[in-house]
Amino acid sequence: MAFKIIASQCTQCGACEFECPSNAIELKGEKYVIDPKKCTECKGVFEIQQCASVCPMPKTCVPA
């Protein structure tokens, strides 16, 4: 299962985009989105999902 970004909570800071090891996050229009085909939930790379760990807004990057 991939992660998703709750658009209404996202501040568009961009921290998640730069931390994603699979380059699954990009800015589309005025919101960041996670490509579910690219998202690996950081498995095999990190113990926790990097998007969720760097996001300044709690529970904005969540399981899809």
Swiss-Prot record:
SUPFAM superfamilies, alphabetized: 4Fe-4S ferredoxins
Spell out where the chain crosses the membrane: none
Lineage: superkingdom: Bacteria
Task: Tell me how the cofactor is bound.
Answer: Binds 2 [4Fe-4S] clusters.
Q: Where does [4Fe-4S] cluster 2 bind?
A: 20, 39, 42, 51
Q: Which residues form the 4Fe-4S ferredoxin-type domain?
A: 2-30
Q: Name one GO molecular function term.
A: metal ion binding
Recorded hits in InterPro entries, A to Z, give: 4Fe4S_Fe-S-bd, 4Fe4S_Fe_S_CS
Pfam families attached to this UniProt entry: Fer4_7 (PF12838)
Task: Provide this UniProt record's keywords sorted from A to Z.
Answer: 4Fe-4S, Electron transport, Iron, Iron-sulfur, Metal-binding, Nitrogen fixation, Plasmid, Repeat, Transport
List the cofactors.
Answer: [4Fe-4S] cluster
Biological process, per Gene Ontology: nitrogen fixation
Q: Where does [4Fe-4S] cluster 1 bind?
A: 10, 13, 16, 55
Q: What is this protein called?
A: Ferredoxin-like protein in nif region
**Species this chain originates from:** Sinorhizobium fredii (strain NBRC 101917 / NGR234)
